[in-house]
UniProtKB/Swiss-Prot annotation:
Sequence positions that bind Mn(2+): H264, D296, D298
Taxonomic lineage from the root: Bacteria, Bacillati, Bacillota, Bacilli, Bacillales
Gene symbol of the encoding locus: rhaA
Superkingdom, natural source: Bacteria
Matching PANTHER family: L-RHAMNOSE ISOMERASE
A GO term for molecular function: L-rhamnose isomerase activity
Keywords, sorted A to Z: Cytoplasm, Isomerase, Manganese, Metal-binding, Rhamnose metabolism
Broad class of the protein's primary localization: cytoplasm
EC main group: isomerase
Cofactor dependence: Mn(2+)
GO cellular component, one term: cytoplasm
Protein name: L-rhamnose isomerase
């Protein structure tokens, strides 16, 4: 009890300090509690899935490491996810890829139906979670010559068009069953290793294939689609069909959400700087918060400058209402549950940091060219007791404070993961 009282006491001191500069910490905590993070299932098993778990991971991505304890069945994955969610404050969502089917039936990607994901839906209901979805355009024999929807081979295109259509029905099913809009994100890794002669025709094929996938109108109360660009992948270094410009044009003209993945751009390019522009022209954004180290390496998200900047952009520009925040990283060199917990809690921390700024006052200073005050206040804020507010948020949401969560992860590793 003394431990809790100490956290509460420290919070009261922090609350007064923030109050002195016009920041209401109670409001900040209330806002943060309502923000759902879509945690990705694929960190739990290194992107293997359950459709063909022994198959090769393709699509220009790579999971490195062999830390023990990866999930091998849907039941194990759900068990691990439950442990992770128990260490993260608030109620969130789970982001599923199509290869995470849960069925005894032998089924291919162009045959999947809502019934193949019913166990996930029943579990999400029990846990109070929402579900997002992703068709899987990789790790499959029909990913031919680095192409799926942009393939010159009609048979290949048709297979993937059918997969895309079926994924929409599954996402719609999630939305109907769970009462939360399911975001269905389309990332298509099609590309060419070396300099292509014709960049135009594959993009035209991709555009036409996507138009066919999206032809049927679905109720956006249940499902909304996002389209995700990428600069390059392994084996597609020279050219990716679904570039940023392609999907910006496609998303805006087809009324789709634009997905921005932190690792899918040039190494010195940041997605935080793109949010305000997209907010002016697109219907909304799906974020894949990730950490690229020299390339799209999908490292676990840490509290670095870009994560802090993403939080600031969303809060300062009032973009939380049109932004869906998801995570996308997979590191097999560390405990996978710890990866989820660190990445999700850090994303929440970046939002809290931004919510604890006197945003209206700072905007007024900027408008009046009072750059001295703007700099002085933003610099002083760096030393404010943000950690005490975060610890209190964890406490009132019934999750471990500080490093206490790590003890739970280590115990779970000993009792469960190392016995697999």
């Amino acid at each position: 009890m003394g431990h809790e009282t100490e956290i509460s006491k420290r919070y009261q001191v922090a609350k007064e300090r923030y109050q002195a500069i016009g920041v209401d910490t109670e409001n900040a905590l209330k806002t943060l509690k309502d923000i759902k993070i879509s945690m990705h299932c694929w960190q739990g098993d290194d992107v293997k899935g359950f459709l063909n778990p022994d198959g090769e991971l393709t699509g220009g991505i790579m999971a490195t490491g062999n830390y023990p304890g990866a999930a091998h069945t849907p039941k194990q994955l759900r068990q691990d996810l439950e442990k992770a969610y128990s260490l993260i404050p608030g109620k969130h969502k789970l982001n599923l890829h199509a290869i995470y089917v849960d069925t005894d039936e032998k089924v291919d990607l162009n045959e999947i139906e809502p019934k193949h994901f019913t166990p996930w839906v029943e579990w999400a209901k029990e846990q109070g979670l929402g579900l997002d979805f992703n068709p899987t355009f990789f790790s499959h024999p029909m990913f031919k010559d680095n192409y799926t929807l942009a393939s010159p081979d009609k048979e290949v295109r048709d297979f993937w068009i059918e997969h895309g259509k079926r994924s929409r029905k599954i996402s719609e099913y999630f939305g109907k069953e769970l009462g939360q809009t399911s975001i269905n994100n389309f990332w298509v890794p099609d590309g060419i290793k070396d300099c292509p002669i014709d960049r135009y025709t594959p993009r035209k094929r991709l555009m036409e294939a996507l138009d066919e996938v999206f032809a049927e109108k679905l109720d956006e109360k249940y499902t909304q689609e996002a389209v995700e660009s990428k600069l390059f992948g392994l084996g597609a270094e020279a050219y990716t069909v679904g570039s940023h410009e392609f999907y910006m044009g496609y998303g805006i003209t087809r009324d789709k959400l634009i997905c921005l993945d932190a690792g899918h751009f040039h190494p010195t390019e940041v997605i935080s700087n793109k949010l305000s522009s997209l907010a002016l022209f697109s219907k909304g954004v799906m974020l894949h918060v990730s950490r690229p180290v020299r390339w799209d390496s999908d490292h676990v998200v840490i509290m670095d400058d870009e994560l802090i900047e993403i939080g600031r952009e969303l809060v300062r520009n009032d973009l939380l209402g049109i932004t869906n925040i998801g995570l996308d990283f997979f590191d097999a060199t560390i405990n996978r549950i710890a990866a989820w917990v660190v990445g999700t809690r850090n994303t929440q921390k970046s939002l809290l940091k931004a919510l604890l700024e006197p945003t209206a006052d700072l905007k007024k200073m900027e408008l009046e060219n009072d750059f001295t005050s703007r700099m002085a206040i933003t610099e002083e804020l760096k030393d404010f007791p943000f950690g005490d507010v975060w610890n209190y948020f964890c406490e009132i949401n019934g999750v471990p404070v500080g490093l206490d969560w790590l003890k739970e992860v280590k115990a779970y590793e000993e009792d469960v993961l190392l016995k697999r």
